[in-house]
Amino acid sequence: MKHNLNAHEARVIGCLLEKQVTTPEQYPMSLNGLTLACNQKTSRDPVMELSESQVQQTLDFLLKKHLIRSQSGNRVMKYEHRFCNSEFGDLKFSPAEVAVITLLLLRGAQTPGELRTRTNRMYEFADVAETEETLKTLSLREDGPFVVRLAREPGKRESRFMPLFSGDVASSLLAAGEAEENNHTLEANPRETHSFENIALEKTALEARVAQLEQQVIQLSRRLDDVLIQLDD
């Protein structure tokens, strides 16, 4: 993948993408504004409680990755993203694609119907079919894929889609997504559906979930180490 983001980096990039469109008068954003945006109680999943120092540390990492840039304001430093559609970047997305990616970064896996409803402040999709077409494009782009379809949950009519910007987790999710796409093809031809294929799909999806949880444990362990170091000081 072109970008490998941890949970905090994904939240910061998502907030910058969101506010650039929804509140352009407040963009670029200050550290305080970004911290408030990251910790919003609505339109965020999971809800985070990041300190300004944690957000600043995340900004420093993103600066090193050249995914954001800073500029001096009248009184404070302000930040804008270089994640996509920037002057020197090669990652280009349409307004519809930006809206979908932003919501996936801020709220995690969602169905096409949920995305259509929740993106209305950034982009007005005509219907769910247009949302699904945008997701399909993002999953098939030659410079991607950028999203993946997850296994459909029991009792649900729609499958959820997940962003692919997290390294090893993305690889595992992509494998699960390919299995899910094969399952959709089989559903269109019931005679070709076999129980062992469903078992393989469930196994792959579980492996992807385990990989995602392992990544979260690693991130929490690093944060705990940082806290212990600060306490020792």
Swiss-Prot record:
Species whose genome carries this gene: Yersinia pseudotuberculosis serotype O:1b (strain IP 31758)
Pfam families found in the cross-reference section: DUF480
Name of this protein: UPF0502 protein YpsIP31758_2048
Transmembrane stretches, start-end: none
Family, as annotated: Belongs to the UPF0502 family.
Record-linked PANTHER family: UPF0502 PROTEIN YCEH
Alphabetized InterPro entries for the sequence: DUF480, WH-like_DNA-bd_sf, WH_DNA-bd_sf
Top-rank lineage group of the source organism: Bacteria
